[in-house]
């Protein structure tokens, strides 16, 4: 599988409690086939964060990679936008 063929998602970090692992919620908008209404779907992915740079609330980009554990199939590419702490 080529590196360019791999899936790349952008989502929000919802958990960073594990060491070197983040949970990213990716939201997609799909039009309902019968009713035509736009429906939001959210799916959570566990991603590898080698240096623990991503924090809860950050917008990050993750890319598909080889299986790193039972659930981890993605790695952190970049932090697109850092969360604002008030």
Curated annotation (Swiss-Prot):
Assembly behavior: Part of the 30S ribosomal subunit.
Gene Ontology CC annotations of this record: cytosolic small ribosomal subunit
Pfam family, one: Ribosomal_S17
Gene Ontology MF terms: rRNA binding; structural constituent of ribosome
Entries under HAMAP family matching the protein: Ribosomal_uS17_B
GO BP of this protein: translation
Keywords noted in UniProt: Ribonucleoprotein, Ribosomal protein, RNA-binding, rRNA-binding
Protein purpose: One of the primary rRNA binding proteins, it binds specifically to the 5'-end of 16S ribosomal RNA.
Top-rank taxon, per record: Bacteria
Family: Belongs to the universal ribosomal protein uS17 family.
Name of the protein in its database record: Small ribosomal subunit protein uS17
């Amino acid at each position: 599988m080529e590196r360019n063929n791999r899936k790349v998602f952008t989502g929000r970090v919802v958990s960073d409690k594990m060491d070197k692992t983040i949970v990213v919620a990716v939201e997609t908008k799909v039009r309902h086939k019968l009713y035509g209404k736009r429906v939001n779907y959210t799916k959570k992915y566990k991603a590898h964060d080698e240096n623990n740079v991503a924090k809860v609330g950050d917008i990050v980009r993750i890319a598909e990679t080889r299986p790193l554990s039972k659930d981890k199939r993605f790695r952190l590419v970049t932090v697109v936008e850092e969360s604002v702490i008030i």
